Structures are given as structure tokens and as C-alpha cells.
Amino acid sequence: MSEDFRPRSDFLQTLLLRGYVHQCSDLEGIDAKAQSGELVAYIGFDCTAPSLHVGSLVQIMMLRWLQKTGGKPIALMGGGTTQVGDPSGKDESRKILSLETIEANKAGIASVFSKFIAFGDGKTQALMVDNAEWLTALKYVDFLRDVGRHFSVNRMMAMDSVKLRLERDQELSFLEFNYMCLQAYDFVELNRRYGCVLQMGGSDQWGNIVTGLDLGRRLGAPQLYALTSPLLTTASGAKMGKTAQGAVWLNEDMLPVFDYWQFWRNCEDRDVGRFLKLFTELPLDETVRLESLGGAEINEAKKILATEATSMAHGREAALLAEEAARQTFEEGALAESLPSIDIDAAEIEAGLGVLAAFVKAGLVASTSEARRQIKGGGLRVNDAPVADERAALQQGDVASGVIKLSLGRKRHVLLKLV
């Protein structure tokens, strides 16, 4: 991307200034389309779980900003591609899901989007479509003859998603090898049906997306464009959206609103400014002001981040209730005054303290083997959330007002106080 490029469209100005852009095939072309008011763009979401988590939130926000700046977003549900499995970023083959599971997952994922974008038949109203509509209707021989002949196996083998698996001598099934062909075909089909000219996604999808551009050119489609967002990690390098309790889900039935609010409140100081730009709609000058706060004042910025981000996912009322619950729990000292505590070096949490070791250190269990038994029985909790994975580690995202609450059963609790 050219550093001299100055976008004229509100869409690209917003994405560039707020940090959403990693790679782009043609900034000038996308800018012109956005200025014309004719930009239709999509992002695909495979149905591998009953909810999306905050790792997908950057992409959802890109669709939201597209709509707010006059474009038309398409949320593509991968009812067809999920049956194959995307090998991108994976060390082993994905588990094959039943059609019933895929449908149930699709319903859970679809419920997220109405919180962020408006659906309907209007020019800028969003569409939700499922690639199973066309992929499951394809005839194999016809697809090979009409579409497959345009793919170069040489180029496919050079894709990171393929090359890394082969270099590590890890199996890559023929099923997964075909995934990029289906994703490329999705782009062409969405162009034919809805005039979609831009595919967006995470940086790990760049190879798949530009394959779609190439296929469109070979099949005579109009000019198509690609744009990806950066891989999102915390300032300490941890994968975005992971805590000791697991993924930070967007659906309330999989993660309480209070825990969602706490996730944002507990972000690292160095992440506050970046997250305010990406996950809220606060004016940029306000995000800069909040980012510049130091000392204890940075906690006020984190509360604003938490409430704004939670408002989008769960509504303003629920966000304010979560904020008040946190105030009563942590700031009025309800926990600190009544529970035993031990001091722990903040560097241990920064490095990722194993949850088994943490419970031993807190004196709640005598050994890691006892901790494992308690986890199997649902007896260990971190910040009142059950620990399901014995390999989990406590991280900065688990810290609330300088403490982490560990519980054995319902009656034994210890606070880890960071020093």
C-alpha cells in the first residue's frame, strides 16, 4: 500500500485511520467505488461453533463501518464451506461436522449480526446469505471443467495454509485442499448475484481472497478487490479473545454480559487506544485523549472501552448494568474485605501462569493432580467462571482491579493480588 495515498471516501478514511487495513489489492479502486455509493462487500464466516468470538469482531466492525458510510454489506454464512473445513492457520484437519450441527451453529452465529448491522432490502441494508445455496448444487464434473481448470496447483501448493502443513509433514486432506477453490467461487457467485466487488477478511485469508480475484478475472467478472485486516493479538502477544475460561463469545447464552464487560475492562494498558479505535465508535480525538491517560486514570479509559464495546454487542442497558455490577463487586471492596488473598508477581500472569499451578500456589489444592480431578468435576472456578481446560493459563485478561478470584467449590475462595 502506498503511504502517499489519501482516501476520499468516508469508508476507506475510517478503516485506515482506525487501524483496520493490513493489505489491499487496489486502494484507489475501492475508494472510487465507495465514493460512487455502489460498493458492495462481503466477509465469510464458517459455522464451526455456535457463536462467533471477539476474534471475529474486527471483521464484523468492518461490515458495520461499510454500512454506516453508505456501502452494502453481505454476511456470508459458510453452510457449504464448513462441510469442507478451512485449513488456514490450522496444524491438523478440522473435525467434520454433521449438517445438523452446522445448521445449529449457523443460527447461533446469525443472531450476532443484527446487533451490529441492519438487514433488509434497502440499498445500504445488509444481506445474509449461505453459500450452501450454490455450493451444494454444483455438479462435480461440471465444476472441474468450468471452474477447476482455472486453478494452478503450483500456486495452490505455494499457499501458506498448504505449504506449512506439508513442510511440517502434517496431513492435508484433498477435502481441505479444495477449500480455496470453493471460497474463490463464492466471490464470483456473489458478484453475479448481488454485484459484490470486495471481499474482506483477516490477514490469514489473503491468499484465498486473491485467488477469488484471479478466478473472477478468468471467468470474465468485473474488477474485484481484496482487503484484509491485521492479525489481532494483545500487546503481550496473546491471541485475542482467550482467557483461562476459554473463548470470549459474542452470544450471551455462551458468555454472560458481565464477563464480556470484564474482558474489555481487563485489557492491557498498551491496548486501550488501539481497542477504542477498533471496537467502539468514539470520535478519534476522544480515543487519543483516553489513550494518553496515565496512572490510575487509564482504568477510567478501560471502563469506557468496556461499556462502549458491550453496548454494541448486548445493548446499552445491559452494558450499564454490567458496569454497575463491577463497581459494586470490585470498587466497593466486597471481595477484598472478606476473602483471603496472596500476593503474586504480575510478571507470572504476564507470562501466562498455568491454572493448575495457580490453584496449588493459592493453597486451594494440594497438587496439580488434585486440581485436574477438581476440573473434571467442575469444582474449580476463575472469577466465578468454571475452568474447563486443565491446560489453560491465567492471563492479563483475567485480572480485575488488580486481583484474580480463584474458587474451589462454592465456599472456598482466594484472591491473587498482583504486585
Curated annotation (Swiss-Prot):
Catalytic activity from the UniProt record: tRNA(Tyr) + L-tyrosine + ATP = L-tyrosyl-tRNA(Tyr) + AMP + diphosphate + H(+)
Positions that bind ATP: 242
SUPFAM superfamilies, sorted: Alpha-L RNA-binding motif (SSF55174), Nucleotidylyl transferase (SSF52374)
All copies of domain S4 RNA-binding, residue ranges: 353-419
Principal EC category: ligase
Residues given in the record as L-tyrosine binding sites: 42, 179, 183
Chain location of the short sequence motif 'HIGH' region per the record: 47-56
One term of GO molecular function: RNA binding
PROSITE patterns per UniProt: S4
Record-listed E.C. numbers: 6.1.1.1
The keyword Oxidoreductase is annotated on this UniProt entry: no
InterPro entries, per the entry: aa-tRNA-synth_Ic, Rossmann-like_a/b/a_fold, S4_RNA-bd_sf, Tyr-tRNA-ligase, Tyr-tRNA-ligase_bac-type, Tyr-tRNA-ligase_bac_1
Subcellular location: Cytoplasm
An example Gene Ontology biological process: tyrosyl-tRNA aminoacylation
Motif 'KMSKS' region in this chain: 239-243
Main location: cytoplasm
A GO CC term attached to the entry: cytosol
One Pfam family, short name: tRNA-synt_1b
Gene3D superfamilies, per the entry: HUPs (3.40.50.620), RNA-binding S4 domain (3.10.290.10), Tyrosyl-Transfer RNA Synthetase (1.10.240.10)
Keywords annotated in UniProt: Aminoacyl-tRNA synthetase, ATP-binding, Cytoplasm, Ligase, Nucleotide-binding, Protein biosynthesis, RNA-binding
Similarity comment: family membership: Belongs to the class-I aminoacyl-tRNA synthetase family. TyrS type 1 subfamily.
Quaternary data: Homodimer.
Function: Catalyzes the attachment of tyrosine to tRNA(Tyr) in a two-step reaction: tyrosine is first activated by ATP to form Tyr-AMP and then transferred to the acceptor end of tRNA(Tyr).
Name assigned to this protein: Tyrosine--tRNA ligase
Gene assigned in the entry: tyrS
